[in-house]
Amino acid sequence: MKIVQYDDVEWKRGLQHRGGTFHYRHLLNGTPGTLGNFQFNIGQLEGDFASPRHRHNFDQFRIQLEGTMNFDRNGKMAAGSVGYFPEGAPYGPQRSEGTSVTAVLQFGSASGSGYLSREEVYAGTEELKKFGTFEGGIFRRNDDVEGRRQTDGYQAIWEHMNGQRMEYPKPRYRDPIMLDPANYEWLPVDGMPGVSEKPLGSFTERQCGASIIKLARGSTYRAGERSVYLVLSGSGIAYDAPYL
């Protein structure tokens, strides 16, 4: 188990292949080069942030902590909402309505396409700048460079780093799924007195899912394997280490 204190992590500038201002705190990551690689960040976007309509070859969960994120025809995520953005399903264009803070978990999913590490994305971005420019989330090749004139920024990076054309997986869901946890009821967790849960959903044949857990004072929760937890309030002990 690894515990990261949010306040111990510095803000950094990121998403340079998209448009506008984005800073993040990088909390956790998996093992680069593996199909199950993942990345967990908390990002802050300003009102000038913009991202074109696009899709992923990985899965994504989003927790809107502050502000409102606008995904155009796919709807808005207000503070407190949770979103599941499945691989292959287009969404956006995306923009922030003022300052927005979001916890984002991205991970290799059912198609087996894996997930690029932040270091790989940065390296690919810098290498591609030798052949073109990133504008508004799109990579545009210079006129004297062979290849497609314009490509989604992340797709261009993925193809450059993998040396092959990206084949998007067929979407298991047509659209992102946005959830309002406030409308869920708390359920007791069997065998764990004082622990309640809001199971928000389980998705695809790989059964990736999201839940909200609440612990009464003095209660104990047994964490599952291959799970990532974000503590939003309170304090306690996790595997003999404190969290605040």
Predicted regions and their residues:
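Jelly-roll (double-stranded beta-helix
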Residues: M1-I63, T68-L244
